[in-house]
């Protein structure tokens, strides 16, 4: 039985509840392009999706974006005095500042954007960044 998954505006089907990341893998049917979506709005950061650049476990695009997001989230908690609402699961992460946004957190988000924009420039078919 096939399961339907929706990630933002990108839809894909997979069998057996597993995602291989390999677009040529048997049982993986693409309805639309797999892509990591990164949205930054008023210093809230949301990362969702899977790049599909390489098979699961060896996808350098996913690994790069994940490392940058995890560093942002942990750095915000450890290096600033702010309070944040966070949500993380496979293929999804979100951090939202609660209350006043500190200059330290603004710097962390700016650094995160430099990193993900670099990845998006190198892999434009796999990562898109929307920032205000």
PLM features: residue spans?
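N-terminal intrinsically disordered, cationic/polar leader segments
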Residues: 30-60, 70-132
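Short, conserved glycine- and acidic-residue-centered signature motifs
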Residues: 61-65
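Short, Lys/Arg-enriched N-terminal segments with co-localized hydrophobic residues
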Residues: 15-34
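Low-complexity, intrinsically disordered or signal/transmembrane-proximal segments
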Residues: 2-5, 10, 19
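Serine/threonine-rich low-complexity intrinsically disordered regions
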Residues: 8, 22-25, 102
């Amino acid at each position: 039985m096939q399961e339907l998954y929706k990630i933002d505006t990108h839809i894909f089907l997979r069998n057996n509840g597993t995602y291989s990341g390999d677009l040529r893998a048997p049982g993986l049917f693409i309805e639309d392009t797999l892509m990591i979506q990164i949205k930054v709005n008023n210093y809230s950061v949301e990362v969702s999706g899977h790049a599909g650049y390489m098979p699961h476990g060896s996808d350098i695009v996913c690994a790069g974006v994940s490392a940058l997001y995890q560093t942002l989230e942990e750095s915000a908690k450890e290096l600033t005095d702010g309070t944040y609402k966070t949500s993380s699961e496979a293929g999804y992460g979100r951090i939202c500042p609660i209350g006043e946004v500190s200059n330290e957190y603004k710097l962390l988000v700016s650094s995160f954007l430099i990193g993900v924009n670099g990845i998006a420039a190198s892999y434009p078919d796999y990562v898109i960044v929307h920032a205000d």
